[in-house]
């Protein structure tokens, strides 16, 4: 019979990070089990971005810690995963939103995201972001007011923009390279990967005793970690725990921006206003006449966003305009209209996108699953059975949170001291009636 100190179900970015930090904490015989190759499925569908700009103090603290860890790994590795600090730029053309944007930014700044600096055209000490690397870059955020100032630094944006909030401790990286760095460092400390499926967890006397695999092998182990991503709930049932999570399909499109509409040194660009899509009059009339397409003429939510990708002309386009809960599938259904809808939505922020109308570049479309709790906080810690732990429900922030989630999970397993934010992510938070009552009026979850 095989013996391990810990078995981790799921080799996505969270499982790999958990393995890395458990190994660093001194646990040597760690088995990472997944039906699929490491860092595939949802981890391979990431936008690969990160930000510390969160309205939730616990989330902000978690992500700040995760960014600290990622920056340390970048320095150790010669920045093998190409972490940058270009930031997130939230843009609005609605004068009524400016005070709201400033007030919300003041609040996030006070929570620990860094100083908020407000700039006008008359007096601006705004420091543009560097395209590569992250050292010697400002944190906090810069609020640029007025079209002239905004377009001085971002000439590709619409002249209707009246405010642009540049969150600075933010950017993107290669999620695959970060994951492989964590996996390889873990392997050097005793982490082993096995392709297979966890089919059962043996619990005796209220304690985890072992794990059964689809190969028929039983692994004796006192610790079982559920890091199964979109299958978190299914795997939780193996120890008799019904985890309060659901999954949603989120899409992403990549196109060649041959016209250079998006600046190659741009930050992540986010349009913060609701809008109706720009159709020609005859197109709009035809769409409105058909009950199945009428929704394309109605109001779409804020949040369409894009960024340049790689050294060529690729751009990513994302917009969560129609998200529904869905059980995870290997080949999820993809909305073939999504790329054109996202491109048309981006034209509100990037007017030259209209030059692609009617001759859109061939898109690459894919989708991954967000696994979420109701309030969009992760689950990290004990799972209600001695020796069973969970690390997941990281929604759309898996890459940016992975390092801190792995570190926190390892602290729970080894009994190390826990950071102040740990209770906010423990499954036991739902045992508190006051916490459950807050869920009905939670407010901004920070989801982009």
Regions found by a protein language model. Give the residues of each.
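Dinucleotide-binding Rossmann-like beta1-alpha1 core, especially the glycine-rich loop
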Residues: 47-149, 153, 301-304
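Glycine-rich FAD pyrophosphate-binding loop
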Residues: 23-44
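Beta1/beta-strand and adjacent pyrophosphate-binding region of the FAD-binding site
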Residues: 1-14, 31
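Active-site lid/adjacent beta-loop-alpha segment flanking the redox-cofactor pocket in flavoenzymes
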Residues: 257-386
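Central helical "cap/lid" subdomain
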Residues: 215-287
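Flavin (FAD/FMN) cofactor-binding core of flavoprotein oxidoreductases
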Residues: 136-152, 324-325, 336-403, 407-413, ...
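Helical element adjacent to the flavin cofactor pocket in flavoenzyme catalytic cores
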Residues: 158-160, 164-223, 227, 231
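Short beta-strand to alpha-helix junction loop
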Residues: 57, 61-64, 91-98, 165-184, ...
């Amino acid at each position: 019979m095989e013996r391990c100190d810990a078995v981790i179900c799921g080799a996505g970015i969270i499982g790999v990070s958990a393995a890395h930090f458990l190994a660093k904490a001194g646990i040597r015989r760690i088995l990472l089990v997944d039906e699929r190759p490491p860092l595939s499925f949802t981890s391979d569908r990431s936008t690969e971005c990160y930000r510390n700009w969160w309205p939730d103090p616990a989330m902000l603290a978690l992500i700040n810690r995760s960014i600290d860890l990622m920056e340390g790994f970048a320095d150790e590795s010669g920045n093998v995963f190409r972490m940058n600090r270009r930031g997130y730029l939230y843009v609005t053309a609605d004068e009524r939103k400016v005070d709201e944007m400033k007030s919300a930014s003041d609040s996030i700044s006070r929570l620990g995201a860094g100083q908020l600096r407000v700039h006008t055209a008359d007096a601006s000490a705004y420091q543009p972001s560097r395209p590569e690397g992250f050292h010697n870059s400002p944190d906090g955020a810069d609020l640029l007011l007025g079209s002239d100032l905004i377009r001085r630094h971002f000439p590709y944006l619409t002249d209707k923009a009246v405010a642009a909030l540049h969150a600075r401790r933010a950017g993107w990286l290669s999620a695959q390279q970060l994951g492989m760095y964590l996996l390889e460092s873990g392997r050097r400390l005793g982490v082993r990967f096995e392709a297979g499926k966890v089919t059962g967890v043996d619990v005796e006397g209220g304690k985890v005793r072992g794990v059964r695999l689809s190969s028929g092998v039983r692994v004796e182990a006192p610790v079982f970690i559920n890091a199964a991503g979109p299958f978190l709930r299914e795997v939780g049932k193996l120890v008799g725990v019904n985890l309060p999570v659901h999954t949603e399909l989120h899409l992403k499109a990549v196109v060649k921006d041959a016209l250079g509409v998006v600046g190659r040194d741009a930050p992540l660009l986010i349009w913060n206003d609701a809008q109706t899509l720009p159709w020609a009059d005859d197109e709009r009339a035809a769409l409105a006449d058909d009950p199945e397409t009428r929704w394309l003429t109605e109001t779409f939510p804020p949040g369409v966003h894009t960024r340049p990708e790689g050294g060529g002309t690729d751009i990513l386009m994302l917009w969560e305009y129609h998200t529904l809960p869905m059980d995870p599938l290997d080949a999820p259904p993809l909305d073939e209209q999504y790329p054109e809808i996202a491109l048309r939505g981006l034209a509100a922020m990037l007017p030259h996108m209209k030059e692609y109308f009617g001759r859109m570049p061939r898109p690459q479309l894919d989708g991954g699953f967000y696994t979420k709790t109701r309030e969009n906080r992760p689950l990290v810690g004990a799972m209600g059975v001695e020796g069973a732990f969970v690390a997941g429900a990281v929604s759309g922030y898996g890459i940016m949170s992975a390092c801190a989630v792995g570190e926190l999970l390892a602290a729970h397993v080894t009994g190390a001291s826990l950071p102040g934010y740990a209770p906010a992510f423990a499954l036991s938070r739902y045992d508190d009636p006051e916490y459950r009552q807050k869920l009905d009026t939670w407010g901004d979850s920070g989801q982009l």
